[in-house]
Amino acid sequence: MPFFADAMNEGAYVLVEFEGKLTREELEAGRWTAQKLLEASGCGKLLIDFTAMLRRISTADIYIFAESLKVFPPGMKIGLIIPLEQKWSAEFAETLAANRGICLKVYIDHETAKIWLLSGS
């Protein structure tokens, strides 16, 4: 499977880690799995890690990804970790998410993203 998904930190958040060369269908499967885990755990925090992906994320992929996040309930907090070479897409992804009422912050470091996700802000 090209992704790992599980509730972490005793259900404090759901982590989805993607790896390899992913298709849009595999990305969608990861999002669907995350959605089911969030429903089961009752938490409102999601951490998505794209750092192990082997392909460059396109502008179209970012747009489609942001659109797919609309299925999550309002008020959900989402941290997105991307490879350093994809940092150019961070502001674009955050703006797309904000325009859809989604609280999303983009990071290049797992620990920093996790600290933000678990903080009260």
Locations of regions flagged by a protein language model:
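Amphipathic, Lys/Arg-enriched alpha-helical "gate/interface" segment within cytosolic domains
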Residues: 1-121
